[in-house]
Amino acid sequence: MVIQLIKLDHIRKTFRVSKRDPGLKNALRGFVKRQYDMIEALADISFQVSDGEMVGYIGPNGAGKSSTIKVMSGILTPDSGECVIDGRIPWKQRREHVANLGVVFGQRSGLWWDVPVGDSFELLRDIYSVPADEYRRNLDRLTEMLDLRDLLKTPTRQLSLGQRMRCEIAAALIHSPKLLFLDEPTIGLDAGSKLAVRSFVSELNRERGTTVILTTHDMQDVEALAKRIILIGKGRILLDGSLSDLRHRFEGRRRLTAEFSGELDFGENQGNKLFVIPDGASLVDIQVSSGSSRAVFELDSCPVSRLVAALSEKVELTDMSVDGTSIDEIVLNMYREYGI
């Protein structure tokens, strides 16, 4: 049975932002009579997330991602709408809510800057009232999985960015939360650190069933972790679907290059080597040399697996590659279509 952990229904949030023109005269005028703009950060946000899901919550800068996370964390109170997480309203039952919530902000630290990382973990244990045996189990497991053993005695300010982010994730999980919000968790990290963080989050979801909401501009994070994508733009949900659906809709055409022994007949001659190209695919180029062939196909609606299976029935494939649109280009195409 699928359990609904998060429910947002018609959430709206508007901020009043002061404004003034540049110059000393306008600055003095601003002291007497301030002017304000009303910025609608969240226009009408509705979605649900099931227990154990990993969801990529994406959108351009200023789309409303962080405001949504703050509402779900209990930091912001919306102007209207309903938000229920694990049976609680975050801003009304904040103490109970945060006891089951872990949050990692890539550009803000949840650790104490001047004390060793291990001391920060001890303080968090007291804040969340984590039993000693559970704390020890969690710390040992997080230390091993995130390779923190050599960092526990080091003050936070002396850590590299990659080291600090691994410690931030451990700090967010020290109390065994059911729900984890990751806001730009790999910002500024090198390739090795990014892979380590992605691997850990994936394993955490698989082993513990932790629900993960990921907001990021790094589409490699989304591709590696999230099966479902929610796109927000100008304070509204524009798309909610699977990553595979997103690819199918915005990827455009892919090309499959196949190398094989012998030749294939793509013409009208009837024979054992006559190859009928599956619907949704077309031949772009064919080269034959020294008893081997190289064919390039363009794929529209035809799945790669269908074309490969059809080729394998006729020839022995020696090499194959698929060139598709990168996840970053797909998301850019999506932004363009929605005008955000």
Residue map of PLM features:
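Conserved ABC ATPase "signature" region
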Residues: 23-31, 122, 126, 134-151
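Conserved ABC transporter NBD signature motif
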Residues: 81-92, 97-98
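Conserved ABC ATPase signature
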Residues: 155-159
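Conserved catalytic motifs of ABC-family nucleotide-binding domains
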Residues: 176
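Catalytic Walker B motif of ABC-type/P-loop ATPase nucleotide-binding domains
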Residues: 180-184
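ABC transporter nucleotide-binding domain
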Residues: 198-298
